[in-house]
Amino acid sequence: MQLNTIKPAIGSTKNRKRIGRGVGSGHGKTATKGHKGQKARSGGSVKPGFEGGQMPMHRRLPKRGFTPLSKKDYALVNLCQLEVFEAGSVIDAEALLKSGIISGVRDGIKVLATGDITRALTIKAHKFSASAREKITAAGGSIEEI
């Protein structure tokens, strides 16, 4: 076997459809576009969402809600991720970055209660969920809001 003699498996390749190349091809003359009409013209197609002049759906439906300009983007940390730290250690932004739990501080760090914590840890973060506070204190740890 040589590289120049390798052929694809039978039936694995298909000839592409060459349109507008004569009547004998079966796709000549109108080139699969039918007769006349907007879609038969060059560049002729309606834009997405166009409904023939009728008021389109995206304009019939009302606008809703808004995007708050002052929304904070917290780096989220779950309690189950903090199990990698030893008991009694102080966990702050620097420790979380070094361990790879978060990739950046952004607008702050928020600790969420997903999973369980079994070690007593001192956690320094900007925000804590109510259930995360309960779980940390129940495990004998302490919380410091920055």
From Swiss-Prot:
Keywords: Ribonucleoprotein, Ribosomal protein, RNA-binding, rRNA-binding. Pfam families: Ribosomal_L27A. GO terms for molecular function: rRNA binding; structural constituent of ribosome. InterPro entries: Ribosomal_uL15 (IPR030878), Ribosomal_uL15/eL18 (IPR021131), Ribosomal_uL15/eL18_sf (IPR036227), Ribosomal_uL15_bac-type (IPR005749), Ribosomal_uL15_CS (IPR001196). Residues 1-64 are annotated as: Disordered. One of its GO terms (biological process) is translation. Gene3D superfamilies: 3.100.10.10. Residues 30-39 have a biased composition (Basic residues). The keyword Chloroplast does not apply. The keyword Ribosomal protein applies. It comes from the Bacteria. PROSITE patterns: RIBOSOMAL_L15 (PS00475). GO terms for cellular component: cytosolic large ribosomal subunit. Belongs to the universal ribosomal protein uL15 family. Binds to the 23S rRNA. HAMAP family: Ribosomal_uL15. Part of the 50S ribosomal subunit. This is Large ribosomal subunit protein uL15.
